[in-house]
């Protein structure tokens, strides 16, 4: 691979909510679009309209009023491979406009994913898209690359899955990786539910997208939940309005911080799990006592669900309460954290030392899909 330097690798971060794709060496992804495949709910009556039987990404999003939207990736695991293939096809041919058989491809996945998921990804890349080489990297590890560190604990929370990955001197510590199947999509669902209590009904897959937008624009994390609830009760200072696509205005008050509070208290949605602060703490406690100090000092946030205002301060406060009293706690929230997994992938795929790590097509042909477990972390 290394001798033909002009062929740049493709980096594709397939999130549960958004696909981020582009070329290795770039500082930002060229294509960012929702991981959605939409199918018409109604039959076409006008001949010659060029109706398609499925739409992907932004096109599905813009026609969502007449479509049923499906996300093929749930909780970081691909649940519908036909739709996933459509998304990759759209990524390569429509968004990046490249021939995948000419470029090595770096894909990402959540840690503690089923092995079969990774094998199937490998198989589709080599057999359907005929890529010359590929690699599957762990998302959180890439985020740490992007932040310029080699040691730290990454709390990566996207649309489908949240995980904490402690990394020391470049090595991920697999025994201490924890995963929480609670992320942005669950928050959107919870916001849909609590908005219903206010009398606003959102039910279809298209309306869920509106609620996701409300969440992204208006929600924030309270530093002190009880106190914030009291403030919201006594005054309307925290109320904000949002204009729906049809021009109707809705008012949202304590829902603004009740929604992301679920991250710190999953019991609110009936999940028997501990919050992201406890998960991070537990992950650190599973590591060797000698390296904990370095981890406490480098808690790196990554992923779209860490974009809520106030999340870093709250995280810092909660971890400080759990950690030994004299411990120095530092929570790092890089401004580009929405894309830091992709940026890390771009850095990794363009390193000269990485070029011998690719799984080549010849190796795949010899060993089959299981090669991915031997060559990728």
Swiss-Prot record:
EC class: hydrolase
Keyword annotations from UniProtKB, A to Z: ATP-binding, Cytoplasm, Cytoskeleton, Hydrolase, Nucleotide-binding
Main localization category: cytoplasm
Family to which the UniProt record says this protein belongs: Belongs to the actin family.
Matches recorded under InterPro entries: Actin, Actin/actin-like_CS, Actin_CS, ATPase_NBD
EC number annotated for this UniProt entry: 3.6.4.-
Name the UniProt record assigns to this protein: Actin
GO molecular function: ATP binding; hydrolase activity
Record's catalysed reaction(s): ATP + H2O = ADP + phosphate + H(+)
Function: Actins are highly conserved proteins that are involved in various types of cell motility and are ubiquitously expressed in all eukaryotic cells. Essential component of cell cytoskeleton; plays an important role in cytoplasmic streaming, cell shape determination, cell division, organelle movement and extension growth.
A Pfam entry, by short name: Actin
Localization terms from the record: Cytoplasm, Cytoskeleton
């Amino acid at each position: 691979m290394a001798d033909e330097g002009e062929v740049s690798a493709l980096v594709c971060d397939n999130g549960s909510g958004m696909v981020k794709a582009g070329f290795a060496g770039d500082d930002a992804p060229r294509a960012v679009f929702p991981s959605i495949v939409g199918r018409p709910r109604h039959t076409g009556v006008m001949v010659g309209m060029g109706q398609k039987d499925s739409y992907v990404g932004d096109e599905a999003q813009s026609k969502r009023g007449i479509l049923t939207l499906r996300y093929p990736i749930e909780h970081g695991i691909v649940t519908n491979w036909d739709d996933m293939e459509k998304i990759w096809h759209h990524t390569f041919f429509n968004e990046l406009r490249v021939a995948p058989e000419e470029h090595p491809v770096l894909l990402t996945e959540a840690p503690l994913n089923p092995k079969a998921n990774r094998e199937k990804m490998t198989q589709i890349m080599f057999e359907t898209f005929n890529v010359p080489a590929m690699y599957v990297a762990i998302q959180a590890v890439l985020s740490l690359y992007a932040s310029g560190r080699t040691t730290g604990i990454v709390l990566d929370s996207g649309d489908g899955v949240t995980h904490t990955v402690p990394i020391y001197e470049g090595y991920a510590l697999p025994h201490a990786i924890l995963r929480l199947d609670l992320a942005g999509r669950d928050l959107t669902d919870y916001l849909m539910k609590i908005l219903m209590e206010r009398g606003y009904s959102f039910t279809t897959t298209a309306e869920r997208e509106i609620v996701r937008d409300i969440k992204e624009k208006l929600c924030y994390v309270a530093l002190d939940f009880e106190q914030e609830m009291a403030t919201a009760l006594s005054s309307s200072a925290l109320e904000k309005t949002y204009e729906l696509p049809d021009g109707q205005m809705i008012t949202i008050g304590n829902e603004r911080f009740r929604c992301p509070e679920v991250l710190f208290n999953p019991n609110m949605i009936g999940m028997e799990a501990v919050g992201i602060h406890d998960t991070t703490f537990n992950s650190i406690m599973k590591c060797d006592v000698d390296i904990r100090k370095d981890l406490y000092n480098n808690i790196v946030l990554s992923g779209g669900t860490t974009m809520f205002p106030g999340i870093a301060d709250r995280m810092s406060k909660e971890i400080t309460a759990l950690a030994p009293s004299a411990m120095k706690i530092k929570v790092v929230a890089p401004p580009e954290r929405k894309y830091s997994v992709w940026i890390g992938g771009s850095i990794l795929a363009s390193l000269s030392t990485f070029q011998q790590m690719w799984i080549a097509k010849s190796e795949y042909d010899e060993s089959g899909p299981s090669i991915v477990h031997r060559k990728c972390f």
